[in-house]
């Protein structure tokens, strides 16, 4: 018997369709409110030049980072010490990967619970609507947990460059966590130590041109669960953030060679809510593709989540210490519950509307209308 052919999944990168598939269409309240290229200057750009010097420079940098974390929980860093050539190589190789034929990318398909590889049109737990993107991801720390069989072997040099990139981003993340630890009145290593054995996951996002970008998202609104995230993005634009519950959104201005830094839920809890964990999302456009590389720094699953410093007059934002694994499980449960509640409300509203339409059609005429 001949083997059954497996259908190639829909890949946005090779789509020539002019109408968005229904599986990507978002409810109206989730659709973009601000264009991908209407940029805001609200997110500060902070130079890290002199961060290792024990003088006024470090104190000034610390002050700026803390202010940004207390306001938005998002800022950009330049003069960060990550080589421009490495950044260029990483972005070039990422684009080359997504330009590969489908069969080359799908060799690293993550379906079936595989850890690391290629994902097509992901969606958050409990949702049917898909994000307009393709992803390749790999787990780089702890080093002993690396599974190079899940790291793509194309294009050439991918593994060597991504390995170096991961190491440099780990160094930068620890440096930033040191600043925040000091701001909380703790030892420089406090936040890093709270992660126990820091986990690092790199997610390379490719957002292809979209036929109807006003109907969908590249990545739905969310907060990151981990400690801190460093995002490298190209100059297209599409990263958006909100700090008022989604009433207003801003598009982060791309800065050449900069990393966008945002605090995750774990970092928010460790600071007892002092440092914000901003909701953010990615929008797409019909003119050009967009690339971003997110490096997530997360605590070990068994790391304890509880405020490290509670200021006078404050109450802990958590009732009790829990593990990061439990914190993440609760987050996923809440997300699933909210998705189900929204789905139920949508169904009920549709039923009410349909009933109203039927009643409007069969409504008998009043006596005055008959005798008129």
From Swiss-Prot:
Residues in Fe2OG dioxygenase domain copies: 195-299
Cofactor info, note text: Binds 1 ascorbate molecule per subunit.
Pathway: Flavonoid metabolism
EC number(s) reported in the record: 1.14.11.9
Annotated binding of Fe cation, by residue: 222, 224, 280
Cofactor: L-ascorbate; Fe(2+)
One GO BP: flavonoid biosynthetic process
Keywords linked to the UniProt accession: Dioxygenase, Flavonoid biosynthesis, Iron, Metal-binding, Oxidoreductase, Vitamin C
Residues given in the record as 2-oxoglutarate binding sites: 290
Record-annotated membrane-spanning stretches: none
Gene3D superfamilies assigned to the protein according to its UniProt record, in alphabetical order: B-lactam Antibiotic, Isopenicillin N Synthase, Chain
Free-text tissue specificity from the UniProt record: Expressed in young cromes.
Catalysis performed (reactions): a (2S)-flavan-4-one + 2-oxoglutarate + O2 = a (2R,3R)-dihydroflavonol + succinate + CO2; (2S)-naringenin + 2-oxoglutarate + O2 = (2R,3R)-dihydrokaempferol + succinate + CO2; (S)-eriodictyol + 2-oxoglutarate + O2 = (2R,3R)-dihydroquercetin + succinate + CO2
GO MF entry, a single one: metal ion binding
Family: Belongs to the iron/ascorbate-dependent oxidoreductase family.
Function: Catalyzes the 3-beta-hydroxylation of (2S)-flavanones to 2R,3R-dihydroflavonols, which are intermediates in the biosynthesis of flavonols, anthocyanidins, catechins and proanthocyanidins in plants. Can act on naringenin to produce dihydrokaempferol, and on eriodictyol to produced dihydroquercetin.
Protein name: Flavanone 3-dioxygenase F3H2
Organism: Crocosmia x crocosmiiflora
Gene behind this protein: F3H-2
């Amino acid at each position: 018997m001949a083997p059954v052919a497996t259908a190639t999944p829909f890949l946005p990168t090779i789509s020539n369709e002019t109408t968005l598939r229904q599986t990507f269409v978002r409810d109206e309240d989730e659709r973009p409110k601000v264009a991908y290229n209407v940029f805001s200057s609200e997110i500060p750009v902070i130079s890290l030049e002199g961060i290792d010097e024990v003088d006024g420079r470090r104190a000034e940098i610390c002050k700026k980072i803390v202010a940004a974390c207390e306001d938005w929980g998002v800022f950009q860093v330049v003069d960060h010490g990550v080589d421009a050539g490495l950044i260029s190589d990483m972005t070039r190789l990422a684009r080359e990967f997504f330009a590969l034929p489908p069969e080359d990318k799908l060799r690293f398909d993550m379906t079936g619970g595989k850890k690391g590889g290629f994902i097509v049109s992901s969606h958050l737990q409990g949702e049917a609507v898909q994000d307009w993107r393709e992803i390749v991801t790999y787990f780089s720390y702890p080093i002993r947990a690396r599974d190079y069989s899940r790291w793509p072997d194309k294009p050439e040099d991918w593994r060597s460059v991504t390995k170096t990139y991961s190491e440099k981003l780990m160094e930068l993340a620890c440096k930033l966590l040191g600043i925040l630890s000091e701001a909380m009145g703790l030892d420089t290593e406090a936040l890093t130590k709270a992660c126990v054995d820091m986990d690092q996951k790199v997610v390379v996002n490719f957002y292809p041109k979209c036929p109807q970008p006003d109907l969908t998202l590249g990545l739905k609104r969310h907060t990151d669960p981990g400690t801190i995230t460093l995002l490298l993005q190209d100059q297209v634009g599409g990263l958006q953030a909100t700090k008022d519950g989604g009433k207003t959104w801003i598009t982060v201005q791309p800065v050449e060679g900069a990393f966008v830094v945002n605090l995750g839920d774990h970092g928010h809890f460790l600071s007892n809510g002092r440092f914000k964990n901003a909701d953010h999302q990615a929008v797409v456009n019909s003119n050009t593709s967009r690339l971003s590389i997110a490096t997530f720094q997360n605590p070990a699953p068994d790391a304890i989540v509880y405020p490290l410093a509670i200021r006078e007059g404050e109450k802990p934002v958590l009732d009790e210490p829990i593990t990061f694994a439990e914190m993440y499980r609760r987050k996923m449960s809440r997300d699933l519950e909210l998705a189900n509640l929204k789905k139920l409300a949508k169904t009920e509203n549709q039923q009410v509307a349909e009933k109203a339409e039927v009643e409007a059609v069969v409504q008998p005429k009043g006596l005055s209308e008959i005798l008129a």
